[in-house]
Each structure stands twice: as C-alpha cells, then as structure tokens.
C-alpha cells in the first residue's frame, strides 16, 4: 500500500470519532469527515502522493454560476468525482480543476433581469460598457454557493486554480482557435436561414434545438390553405389558366414574403373542380391529398372527389408556371412567383404544394437560390414587419397572423382555415417561440469533415455503448455547418476586422494579443466589448487613406468557448504546450445525454478540425433526472426536493449512492424522491455500517481491552475462506466494471456482496464471534471491511472514510491503494459450492414462508434433491443451522419442472427497456440456466432479478432450486419441536428487551418470564439452558400468571 503518512496528531487523532451506533447519522458523519478533510488537506495530499504517476486527464464541463445546482448537476458531479477518485487509487495523477462558463445569453438575460430591462434597444441606450459590467457581475453571483454545494457533496476539485471563460488567457486561446480554423477554411461568413430568437435578436445553431427535450413544445397555430391562381403563357399551354394552386401553411406571417411555390417533380398532381354551389373554381393539389380536401371542395367523400378529377400531371410538368402573388409588395421582382420543383416536398401533409418564403425556410432558400429566385427579408430583428409591408408595418409577426388571415379571407384567397397543434421549437434560454430567418452569420464548416468525425467516433468508448453508432453517429451524419456568431454583447469577440469601404476590401483575422497589439499599438487587458470595438486603424489597402478597419460587431457563440475548453483552460498554445500536446485527448468526460448533440458534439468537431483527433476517449452520457411528478426536474415547477435539505437529513452519500447505482447511468430517466433515497440507503450503506458496528461491538467484547484485528487472508475456516474468495471476486468484478466506466454495475456488485456478508457470513459465523477465541473470524471480517471501504470510497466517500478510519486508525481511505485481487484466495470451486448452499437455504426459507412456518420453529428434517451432489454433503451442518432442522439428507435425483419468474421492480432499474424482453422470454420458455447463471431472451440476469418456481411440485412441502432440484421439508411438528419453537421465540423476545434497555452484549441479566399456564412453563423449563445461554441469563424465573395473553419478559442487569 502507498504511504499514508504517520498516524499522528495531524490525522486520525484530530478526527472526531463518534460513538458507534446501530444506525448511522449520515449528515453528522459527513460533517465530521468534511471538517477533517479540510483541516488535513486530504485532497491536496492525494494529488501530491500521485504526482509522479501517469497523468490521467479529465474534462470537467464548466457550469453557469448564475443559478444553484439541482439533482441533475449533482449526478454529473458525483460521477465527475467518483471516476477520478478511482483512477487516483489506481496510481494515476488526476488534477481536477474547476471552471466557470461565463459568457453568452444566460449571462445577458440574468443581467437584463437585474437591470430591469427587457429589450435589446435598451442595452444600446444604456451603453454596452455598463451592460457588460452588469453581465460580468451576474455570472459570478452564485460562485460561493456553488463551491459550498460542491464541497458538501464531497467533490474534490481545485477551485483556486480554476478558470473562467471570461479570463483574458482563456479568450486569447479562443481567438487562436478561430484564426487557425479561419486560415484552414473551416470558418467562413455566409448568408443562411437559421433558427432565430426574435426576443434576444440573435441567430442560434441547429444543435441548440436538439439538446433539450423542452426546446420543442406543443403550440396551437393557424393552419391556412391558400389559393394561388395560375397565370401566364405556360399555364395556358398546359390548360391550367384560371386554375388555382392550393398551398398549406402554419405560418401565415410568412405569406407577405412568398416568392415561389414548390412541388415534388415525380408526384401526381390533379385538377379538380369545386362542387360547391355557385362556385366554378378549379384547384390544383397533390392527388394523395385529395381525400383530406374533399369536404372543403364540396364533395361527400374522397371517392367522389377522385371521380371528378379533370386532369393529372406530374410535378415536373407544371414547373415554371407563374401565379398571381398574394400581395403586391414585391410584384416586380425578377424570377419570383413561379412554380419550382424539388424532392424535399412532403406530400403526406397539406396539399403537396409548398408556399416558399426563402427568407424563412432553409429548404425554401436552397431551392429558390438554385432557380435564381430572390430572398427578401420583410421583418426586422425584433420580428416586426418593415415599412415595405405597408399593411402590417411595425406589427409583430405573431400578432399579424390573425390580421393577415382576415385580409386574405376577405380577398377570397383562403380555401380552408383550421387550428393546428404541433411541436414547435422555442429558445432554450428565454423560452420564446423561435422563427427561421435569413441572416448573415459566421459558420464553422462541419459538413466537409463529417466522414472524418464518424471515423474518429469509432475510437471513443461510449457509455451506454449504443450511443456510438446510435445517437452520436446519426447526429454526425446529418450535421450542418455551425453558426458561431451571435449579434449580442457579452462574449468572446469575433476577431475579424473589415474595411468600411467596399471599394477597398480587406479582411484581417487575429489570433493573439500580440497580433492585435502590434497592429493597433494598444496594450490590451480586456478583449470584451466595447473595448475591443474601439480598436480601429487605417486600411493598409486603401491608397487614399480614407477607409478604416473596423471589427465585425458579433460575438462568438458561447458553445465555441465551451468547445475550446481542452486547450483554452491551459492557455494553449501560448503556455503549457508540452502538457497539452502530450494529452490532447481526455481520458474521461461525463454529461447528461442532451450533450450528445451539444458539448460532446462540439468538442468532437473542434478537435477534429484543429488536431485531427478525438477530444476524449471515454464518455458517460447519463439520463435525465425527473421530478416527483415524472417531468424533468425544474426550478420553476419545484418538483424535486430541496437539495440542501436532503443533504441535511438523508446525507449526500445517500443521494450519491441512489443516483450512481441507478439505471440513469445507462441513459434512462430517474425520478428523484426522498423515499427512494431513503430506500437506497438500505441497499449498501446500512449493511456496510451494520457489519462494521457488529465487528466493533464483538471485537471490543472478545477480551479485556478488545481484540485488535489485522489484515489477514490466511484463515482455514470454510466460511472465512468463502468470504475472502468472494471478496477477491468482488474486487475483480468492481475493477472490471469501473475500468469500462460502468459504475451502476459496479455498485450493484457491492450491493449484492454486502447482502451476502450480513445475511450469510456474519449470521452463520455469529457463534464464533461470540466465543471470542477464534481470532481468524475477526481478522477475516476486518479484512473484508477494510477492502469494502476501499472499494466503496468511490461510491460513498464519506461513509467509507468514517468506517475506514475507525476500523484501521489510518489517515484516509482516499490515500490508500485500490485493492489487488491477487491478495485474496482464489477458491472459485468453494465459492460456487457455497453459493449453491446459500440458494438451497434461501429456497428452504422461502418454502417455510410459503407454508407459514416461522424460521424459529425447528423442524425434524430437510430433504434436498439435486442433479449432482458433489461436495454438498460436507455443508449439511450449515444447511441444518440455517433452515433450523434437526437433520439434512441430500440425494441425487431428477429435478422438478421449473418456471422462470422475473422480478420487474428489481430487474427494471438495471435492464431498463430490456426488462419487457426478458419477461416475454420467460413466459414463452426462452431461457436457460447454466450452473446458476440464468439468461432469458439472450440477456443475462443477476441472481436477485428472478425466481425459479415449480411448474409441477412433488408436493406442497417442496420448492424447486434455481440450479435444478428441490428442497422438501418435513412439516410435522411434535411436542418437543413445538416446545423448542416456543423457547426460541422467547429468546427473540428477550433479545429485543435487551436492546430496549441498551445493554452491552456482554452484560449478564436476571430474567423473569411470565407464562399463561403450566404447560408453557414446562416447555420453557425443558429448554432453560438454551434460553440462558443465548441471552446471557444468570438467573431465570418462570412464573405462571393466569389470564395473560402470551409470554411476557422483564429483565435487569445481573448484579451479584
């Protein structure tokens, strides 16, 4: 083991050991441990002792500090702490530097809220300098509270040397990345249709619409089917003069900027006359849409409408036909108001004819650009109509919808109006409904490197594994160029200066402070607006000297900052060159699944473009934390418990275990509730604590001054050999799962092991501990507990620390080495056999429960039938004691028919969606059992996730074994057995009374037992020796009291 330092006043003796109690007070324990870590500087010591180990790189995704953490943050934080702890115990050097995300809309919106302003124009009025100063202050509002939360959840991070994206060094590295990519041709300026937030008056990136399920919300909009009369020579030639094309839209506000209609080239379109009275109109629409429009065209059915088709044409035949525009605003535009064709047209909805507004539709613009149709933007940055649209000038587009509908209806241009409920994108920050708008923006060219990004993706280990070729690969395959500019104020500036005179064009891009200072002659201490905007200089390419180089006003998307984190946190390439280039790819990264399309994606894009390599080697994508109402945990909904209140009542380690051991680490969702957290405590923390408490009490009682146990794997007792070998297998399994970043499976191994430790090893060894002379039992349990503390340090760091320090008197479990499987005996045959014995016993106890026979009631015999007896015979005494039977017989024989019963509540958290697969497989008999390893539908099951039940029992007193065979109990109870059962019930009653009086386990007692009649008295007298031995009774009086109900006991500490 590594050197932990002297056990002196600097460590354990300063630690406030609490008097052991049967149940842990987790908040109090955690308070003690945190205080010790702080004074002892244990985190710093853990780094110092590993500083010569291999550097293991972990990227800690920076949070925004303008709000307090919720359970989603906690989960990510727990994983960010657990994996580095594990790697540190494995000998790696794992620096953990905390960072803060400080730029972008979140900061600006918070500043606007504090300043009491709501519009972008108000920012311009007050001045960018004042606004950005408010933004700077707002982003650090909750830093101290975040540190408090992070420390309280036992996360070990370095705050002192942390970074902020607003730091000058960080921003300089971002400028370097921009210029490098610009020189490579990866960054370019373009004019495209993008998601646009009219409230924040800035474009967004397509990936920002896919990161969060809450971006898309149900919205009710007007759905209009509008008529477009066909005109011109080609319409006459095709016999369509006077026919009106029907186009469907859910955005009436885009109709004033309609420039074209688009059809699908190889789809059939039909001309149908209106069947309405006093109407002689003819309409053109997609043939497949006719059924849905039959009624509004005046037909009783789609069949009637189809029977009235006058003409059928392919879309490509009507391409080039002109139509009468809805409005006259752009009537004179060349190439406008023509039918175009393209395969993107969806004919399953609407009329199969798309109203194209190239200023507000990505595909609309692509098609219109190809045909030379102009793009006109008729709204301003705030989504209000410009003066060109005179009827609606100054009106917000959403307010204009109803007015436009009314005007078109008045003009007879609407065939059908309905309300349409659909999923609609909203801004991920301000939650306003987004629009699509043609804007000039700077782009990160991703489409050219998609294939390389897909190739590099194969080098990444994803958890869950399905992400690699599933969500992430699919997202990469359809990736679009990333809009990286924002028409905002608080962010890293785009480092591009342009000539203000197009007659003398020039563009300069800067990638360092030195380049800026050399050209502008000013020492820079801040790269934010407006300071950076003041940098101007004469255009070197203008011989007249009249034009000036001015910076483009936009700032970078905050996600560009985030994607630069791997190198910008180190101020690369200006510092730490060797350090970064030796570890360009992080060993580990973790965030929630939404970041597959966010930070993970952009890190991958940035690393591919800059370094032609992966940004990270291993990634965990955990699922979404839900509130107690099943919705995503939300501060506004207040649908989850107060985080700090849970810390102060249940404890952080309880929350940590609950989250880390759940299916959320496999990408599923998880509902957080206090009850579930409390239930989780009983899975691992309580059994661990109970085992240590048992060890402490019994080792203290073993001899005067107590027995000082030692780490030993030498015992030859069969139960000791079993639990030591089982511990070695536990180390092997937990290590394997941790190495593959499967923390949930590792946690389940620990949970299952402590159940075996408490319910089997300790219970079956209780007499040896009580005797006190068998030091092998104490050494074995000490060894197991010491190992459990080291394994559990990753999962419950504070409880493990407390138990470890009290157990070993060492400085800290977190300064110890990870257990070595080679330390432990490797008796797999013994383990397999003993596990069979355990299953025999659990089956027998389950049979008792089914038959209504208490475990304390002795029975005469148990008969065990198995396909192969093997070495089971030598375990008869253990089976007899566990099943409370006088004799055990074991024979080889045929097995009863068995059925597999899945336990969904147990299997569900691990298997998630696969649980239904295994249930169905079990029902149809598609399952196998090989040496106790059960597989259903090809999916392996854990021991506690199923039951094997008899399909046809030998008798009601038999129960099938999970590995084949059966247990049969002789349920005949004679008077002697019944008397012993009464005596054992009485012993149990006395033990409860001892606990209630808070007696030490070594305290002797005087006992008075009152019974209702002589028969019961005689029964107890027959087993008085048993009663006295089991309860440490030195004086026993059994009295008959007529009329009492049952047996009562009273006791006192014995005094000679």
Curated annotation (Swiss-Prot):
Its EC number is 6.1.1.5. A motif ('HIGH' region) lies at residues 63-73. It comes from the Bacteria. Residues 1-26 are annotated as: Disordered. It catalyses: tRNA(Ile) + L-isoleucine + ATP = L-isoleucyl-tRNA(Ile) + AMP + diphosphate. It is found in: Cytoplasm. A motif ('KMSKS' region) lies at residues 632-636. Belongs to the class-I aminoacyl-tRNA synthetase family. IleS type 2 subfamily. IleRS has two distinct active sites: one for aminoacylation and one for editing. The misactivated valine is translocated from the active site to the editing site, which sterically excludes the correctly activated isoleucine. The single editing site contains two valyl binding pockets, one specific for each substrate (Val-AMP or Val-tRNA(Ile)). HAMAP family: Ile_tRNA_synth_type2. This is Isoleucine--tRNA ligase. The gene is ileS.
């Amino acid at each position: 083991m590594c050197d932990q330092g002297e056990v002196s006043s600097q460590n354990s003796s300063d630690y406030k050991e609490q008097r052991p109690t049967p149940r842990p007070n987790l908040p109090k324990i955690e308070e003690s441990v945190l205080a010790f870590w702080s004074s002892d500087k244990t985190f710093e010591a853990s780094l110092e002792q590993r500083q010569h180990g291999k550097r293991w790189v972990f990227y800690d995704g920076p949070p925004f500090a303008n709000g307090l953490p919720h359970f989603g943050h906690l989960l990510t934080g727990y994983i960010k702490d657990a994996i580095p702890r594990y790697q540190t115990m494995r000998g790696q050097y794992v620096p953990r530097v905390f960072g803060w995300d400080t730029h972008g809309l979140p900061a600006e919106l918070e500043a606007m809220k504090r300043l009491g302003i709501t519009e972008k124009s108000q920012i311009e009025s007050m001045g960018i300098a004042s606004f950005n100063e408010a933004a700077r202050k707002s982003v650090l509002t909750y830093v101290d509270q975040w540190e408090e939360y992070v420390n309280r959840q036992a996360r070990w991070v370095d705050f002192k040397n942390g970074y902020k994206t607003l730091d000058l060094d960080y921003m300089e590295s971002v400028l370097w990345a921009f210029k490098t990519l610009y020189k490579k041709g990866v960054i370019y300026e373009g004019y495209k249709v993008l998601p646009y937030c009219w409230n924040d008056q800035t474009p967004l990136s397509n990936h920002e619409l896919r990161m969060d399920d809450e971006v898309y919300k149900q919205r009710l909009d007007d759905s209009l089917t509008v008529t477009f009369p066909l005109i011109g020579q080609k319409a006459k030639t095709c016999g369509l003069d006077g026919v009106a094309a029907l186009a469907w839209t859910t955005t009436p506000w885009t109709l004033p900027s309609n420039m074209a209609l688009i059809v699908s080239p190889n789809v059939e379109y039909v001309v149908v006359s209106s069947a309405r009275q006093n109407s002689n109109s003819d309409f053109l629409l997609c043939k497949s849409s006719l059924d849905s429009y039959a009624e509004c065209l005046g037909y009783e059915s789609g069949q009637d409408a189809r029977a009235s088709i006058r003409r059928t044409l392919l879309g490509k035949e009507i391409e080039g036909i002109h139509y009468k525009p809805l409005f006259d605003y752009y009537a004179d535009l060349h190439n406008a108001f023509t039918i175009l064709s393209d395969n993107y047209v969806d004919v399953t909805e609407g009329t199969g004819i798309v109203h194209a507004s190239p200023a507000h539709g990505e595909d609309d613009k692509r098609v219109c650009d190809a045909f030379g149709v102009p793009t006109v933007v008729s709204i301003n940055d705030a989504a209000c109509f410009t003066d060109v649209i005179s009827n609606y000038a100054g009106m917000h587009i959403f307010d204009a919808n109803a007015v436009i509908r009314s005007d078109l209806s008045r003009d007879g241009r609407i065939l059908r109006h309905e309300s349409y409920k659909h999923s609609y994108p909203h801004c991920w920050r301000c939650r306003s409904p987004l629009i699509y708008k043609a804007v000039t923006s700077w782009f990160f060219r991703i489409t050219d490197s998609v294939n390389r990004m897909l190739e590099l993706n194969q080098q990444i280990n994803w958890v869950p594994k399905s992400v690699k070729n599933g969500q992430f690969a699919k997202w990469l395959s359809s990736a679009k160029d990333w809009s990286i500019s924002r028409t905002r104020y608080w962010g890293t500036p785009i480092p591009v200066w342009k000539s203000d005179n197009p007659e003398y064009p020039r563009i300069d891009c800067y990638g360092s402070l030195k380049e800026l200072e050399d050209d502008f002659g000013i020492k820079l201490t801040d790269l934010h607006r407006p300071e950076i905007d003041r940098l101007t200089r004469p255009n070197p390419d203008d011989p007249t000297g009249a034009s000036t180089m001015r910076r483009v006003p936009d700032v970078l998307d905050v996600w560009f900052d985030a994607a630069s984190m791997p190198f910008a946190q180190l101020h690369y390439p200006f510092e730490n060159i060797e350090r970064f280039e030796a570890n360009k790819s992080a060993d580990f990264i973790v965030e929630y699944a939404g970041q597959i399309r966010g930070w993970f994606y952009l890190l991958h894009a940035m690393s591919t473009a800059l370094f032609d390599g992966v940004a990270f080697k291993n990634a965990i994508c955990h699922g979404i934390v839900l509130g107690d109402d099943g919705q995503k945990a939300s501060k506004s909904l207040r649908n989850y418990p107060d985080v700090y209140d849970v810390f102060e009542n249940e404890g952080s380690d309880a929350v940590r275990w609950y989250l880390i051991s759940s299916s959320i680490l496999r990408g599923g969702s998880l509902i957080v509730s206090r009850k579930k957290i409390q239930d989780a405590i009983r899975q691992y923390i309580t059994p661990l604590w109970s085992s240590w408490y048992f060890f402490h009490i019994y080792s203290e009682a073993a001899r005067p001054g107590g027995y000082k146990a030692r780490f030993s794997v030498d015992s030859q007792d069969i139960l000791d050999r079993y639990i030591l070998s089982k511990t070695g297998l536990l180390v092997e399994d937990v290590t394997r799962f941790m190495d593959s970043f499967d923390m949930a499976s590792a946690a389940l191994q620990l949970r299952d092991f402590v159940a075996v430790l408490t319910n089997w090893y300790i219970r079956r060894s209780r007499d040896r501990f009580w005797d006190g002379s068998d030091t092998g039992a104490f050494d074995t349990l000490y060894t197991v507990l010491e190992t459990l503390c080291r394994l559990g340090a990753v999962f419950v760091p504070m409880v493990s620390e407390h138990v470890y320090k009290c157990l070993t008197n060492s400085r800290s479990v977190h300064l110890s080495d990870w257990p070595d499987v080679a330390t432990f005996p490797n008796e797999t045959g013994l383990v397999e056999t003993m596990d069979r014995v355990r299953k025999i016993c659990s089956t027998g106890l389950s049979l008792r429960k089914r038959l209504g026979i208490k475990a304390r009631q002795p029975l005469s015999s148990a008969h065990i039938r198995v396909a192969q007896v093997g070495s089971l015979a030598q375990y008869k005494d253990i089976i007899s004691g566990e099943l409370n039977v006088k004799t055990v017989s074991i024979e080889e024989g045929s097995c009863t028919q068995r059925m597999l019963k899945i336990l969904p509540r147990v299997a569900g958290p691990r298997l998630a969606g696969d649980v239904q697969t295994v249930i169905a497989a079990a029902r149809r008999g598609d399952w196998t059992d090989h040496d106790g390893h059960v597989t259903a539908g090809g999916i392996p099951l854990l021991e506690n996730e199923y039951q094997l039940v008899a399909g046809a029992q030998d008798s009601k007193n038999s129960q099938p074994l999970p590995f084949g065979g059966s247990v049969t109990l002789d349920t005949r109870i004679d008077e002697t057995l019944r008397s012993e059962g009464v005596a054992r019930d009485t012993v149990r009653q006395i033990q409860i009374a001892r606990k209630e009086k808070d007696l030490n386990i070594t305290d002797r007692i005087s006992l008075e037992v009152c019974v209702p009649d002589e028969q019961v008295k005689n029964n107890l007298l027959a087993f008085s020796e048993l009663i006295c031995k089991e309860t440490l009774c030195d004086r026993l009086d059994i009295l008959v009291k007529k009329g009492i109900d049952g047996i009562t006991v009273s006791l006192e500490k014995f005094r000679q």
